[in-house]
Amino acid sequence: FNLLVKLNQRNPEVQNYHFDTIRFWVDEFDIDGIRLDAADVLDFDFMRGLRRVANEVKPEFWLMGEVIHGDYSRWANPEMLHSVTNYELHKGLWSGHNDHNYFEIAHTMRRLQGLCHDTRLYNFSDNHDVERLPNKLRNRDHIRHIALLVYTLWGIPSIYYGSEFGIEGKKEWGSDWPLRPCLELTDYTDAEKTNPVTSIYAALGSLKAECPELSWGEFKELTLTTQSYAYARVLDGKAIVAVYNNGDSPVSMEFQLPVEASGVEDLL
């Protein structure tokens, strides 16, 4: 990151300047959190200091960092950041569908749970730095599969503006600007009724708000093949089960429900 300003993050004056900045924004504007760009080059003790100040000024204040590679628990833990960008899952979401290989997504979830435990990572399908899903998927119908995964896997779902409309965005000549277009919302007034991508995002947003299982429920894998995947989010004797088929024809799946039940309900 040669273009970034180099600050001595161990200098007390530098630290206090940033600590006071958090205090100012909370006192003046009651902000709820900040995103730390390129958090993987920040000093760990500096981030510990940020967390201490955040806890002091507003217990629910949220610190999220941009981290691409590595063991995410080094940055996201009870002493430093609350969460980091989940690029590892992001890669599996689109390539796992292109390759018809749900093992990639399942393996990623197992690995991240082993490393990060209860920490909820910042899950996304696309953002301002990566090409949008319609330009990466071989089958654009899989956009809806990925939306469901982002909302129901363990973590915090993040929707990049325009993704709820399924817009395209491909890097050109090394520039990210095609990923960041200006949208006129008046062009999408009826999108929830006419656009299947928008309708699934709207339904998932409502489901997330109504069902605490999707925020706090234990994640349990139920069955897995290259083309089919099922898991549950379980909380207080209730379970939400998500079932996927990335193939071109129907499949049959058998698995044990994670809770006792007399029936099931289709939530979407």
Positions of PLM-derived features:
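Aromatic- and acidic-residue-enriched carbohydrate-binding clefts of CAZyme catalytic domains
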Residues: 1-9, 178-181
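Short catalytic-loop micro-motif centered on adjacent basic/acidic residues
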Residues: 33-39, 133-134
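Structural recognition of the beta-strand scaffold that forms the well-ordered cores
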Residues: 33-35, 62-65, 122-124, 151-152, ...
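Surface beta-strand/loop "capping" patches
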Residues: 214-238
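Asparagine-centered strand-capping/turn motif at beta-strand->loop junctions
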Residues: 243-247
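Solvent-exposed beta-strand/loop surfaces of large extracellular or lumenal domains
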Residues: 265-268
